[in-house]
């Protein structure tokens, strides 16, 4: 019996030793630039919310330092000050534009708003503004997040800025073509195990190597055949319902609400030569016909022709990736999958305008304060105010902070 236990201990020790060695070796492998990989490294799965930002994180993301607290909310721990006396607490709900994509924490609109308020009213009361922006969140996730986590913070006021991801068809986890509300909570034990394994760089490298193209395709859409015909993450009707429910819950808990509209860079989405759209559609249609017939090389020619007419065609990039996957060229396929995801942002514009219209309507009907950054963004369009086509830079965040500040003054909040 003792001999058996001894061998078990020896085997476990060997496995642990080899695991440590392999993990060290994995960290010596040169890292490739991978946007989706960078995003997922900041996130982890969540049973109810699909994902959350990792707690107590300290890393670089999009070339800027990112730190999170125990709730996974973005903070600057080195500059944190304990609030004393009467503190008016504001929580900024939203997605990556609220989180501060490609900007320093000090430049996020939540941080700038806190400074503006304390500079003006600091002698009377203290303002604490919490950045509760979570990368990739829709209004559906925001509603669940409010109920499960944010109410515990006991905010006096929340700002609500959703819509950007509601009109998308992609999720960073569990992207399977279904809408957000159709996903059931995932087994908590399974989620915990997956998160534990994903902490290992060696495990992630092995997973990426084994499922290289498949994981890229799954991360992008879940099912490539249905991606452009699948459901939006949140329909317009459900978006309206989610925002109204957020307002109802806030009112029930005596929390004031400001709805926020953050525009995207419309100028970057304008077609340079509109007349070429027809040629793009023809080439894309021919390519799809060839793809169905397994005439892969002919399909590639047509999809590249489509890109010549519209260089932002997410569909052309996507189906090029499918072609190269079928040709057993995973590196090229993954490149085109990545490009397809980037260009899919182009398709957000029309949908986001509809959802922003819903926000305006709700604010008008319910008498909810609206902080609309759109007009100020248009007035400042000659300046550089975007870090990416869908994310404001530090100057853009300054504008958003100012319109929220003005809304607070107008409504005496």
How would you describe each model-predicted region?
Residues 139, 143, 236, 240, ...:
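Short, amphipathic alpha-helical "lid/cap" segments that border enzyme active or binding sites
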Residues 122-151:
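A conserved hydrophobic secondary-structure block that centers on an alpha-helix together
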Residues 9-24:
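Hydrophobic membrane-insertion alpha-helices, especially the h-region
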Residues 150-159, 164:
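Proline-aspartate-enriched helix->loop->beta-strand connector
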Residues 24-36, 268-269:
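Helix-to-loop transition at the C-terminal end of transmembrane segments
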Residues 89-93, 130, 158-160:
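Conserved beta-strand elements of the Class I
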Residues 107, 123, 163-361, 365, ...:
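Serine-dependent acyl-ester chemistry module
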Residues 31-124, 380:
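Membrane/wall-proximal cationic-aromatic binding patches
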């Amino acid at each position: 019996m003792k001999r058996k236990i001894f061998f078990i201990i020896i085997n476990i020790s060997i496995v642990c030793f080899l695991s440590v060695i392999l993990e060290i070796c994995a960290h010596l492998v040169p890292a490739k630039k991978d946007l989706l990989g960078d995003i997922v490294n900041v996130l982890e799965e969540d049973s109810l919310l699909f994902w959350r930002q990792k707690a107590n994180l300290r890393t670089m993301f999009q070339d800027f330092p990112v730190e999170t607290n125990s709730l996974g909310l973005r903070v600057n721990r080195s500059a944190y000050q304990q609030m004393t006396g009467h503190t008016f607490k504001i929580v900024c709900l939203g997605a990556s534009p609220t989180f501060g994509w490609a900007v320093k924490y000090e430049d996020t609109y939540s941080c700038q708003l806190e400074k503006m308020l304390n500079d003006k009213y600091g002698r009377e009361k203290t303002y604490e503004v919490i950045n509760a922006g979570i990368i990739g969140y829709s209004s559906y996730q925001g509603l669940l997040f409010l109920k499960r986590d944010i109410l515990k913070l006991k905010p006096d006021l929340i700002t609500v800025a959703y819509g950007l991801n509601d009109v998308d068809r992609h999720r960073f986890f569990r992207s399977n073509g279904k809408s957000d509300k159709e996903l059931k909570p995932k087994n908590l034990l399974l989620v915990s195990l997956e998160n534990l394994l994903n902490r290992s760089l060696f495990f992630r490298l092995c997973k990426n190597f084994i499922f290289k193209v498949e994981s890229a395709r799954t991360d992008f859409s879940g099912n490539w055949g249905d991606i452009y015909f699948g459901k939006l993450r949140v329909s317009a009707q459900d978006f309206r319902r989610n925002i109204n429910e957020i307002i109802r819950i806030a009112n029930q808990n005596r929390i004031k609400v400001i709805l926020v509209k953050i525009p995207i860079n419309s100028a970057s989405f304008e077609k340079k030569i509109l007349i070429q759209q027809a040629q793009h559609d023809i080439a894309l249609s021919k390519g799809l016909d060839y793809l169905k017939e397994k005439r892969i090389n002919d399909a590639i020619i047509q999809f590249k022709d489509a890109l010549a007419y519209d260089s932002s065609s997410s569909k052309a990039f996507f189906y090029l990736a499918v072609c190269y996957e079928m040709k057993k060229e995973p590196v090229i396929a993954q490149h085109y999958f990545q490009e397809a995801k980037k260009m899919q942002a182009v398709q957000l514009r029309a949908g986001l305008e509809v959802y922003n219209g819903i926000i305006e309507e709700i604010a008008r009907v319910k008498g909810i304060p609206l902080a609309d950054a759109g007009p100020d963004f248009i007035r400042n369009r000659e300046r550089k105010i975007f870090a990416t086509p869908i994310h404001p830079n530090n100057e853009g965040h300054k504008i958003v902070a100012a319109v929220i500040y003005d809304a607070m003054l107008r409504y005496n909040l």
